[in-house]
Amino acid sequence: MNAIDLCSDLTARKSKLAVVGLGYVGLPLAVQFAKHYDVIGFDTNEKKVARYKAGVDVTGEAGDAALKETDCQFTAQEEALKDARFFVIAVPTPLNGDNTPDLTAVKEATALVARHLSRGSIVVYES
């Protein structure tokens, strides 16, 4: 499958899009994408995911009403990612003491997503 086919499948809701990291950037992305695509919103923080499922936006970026209305599938279960073909990694990249980015979360999220990639999958990094 090529990128054009994947885009068509996403639009037809035959393939799923996953947003990995549901903080200030990832949560509003997931909510907006879910207006047009089947979206898996993944975060390793189970308490945060439970709040999102209850319609409570702990980031203040998307809003409680948007969370209550969204079709986004919020989860902290890694195995849910096996159903995705398009991934957006949106995890923190804080600065180290020497003003270089700390890529620990990016590397961990990359390894997590890599376990669920299939031929033709697409990964986008949003930082």
Predicted regions and their residues:
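Structural/interface elements that position substrates and couple domains in central-metabolism enzymes
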Residues: 1-127
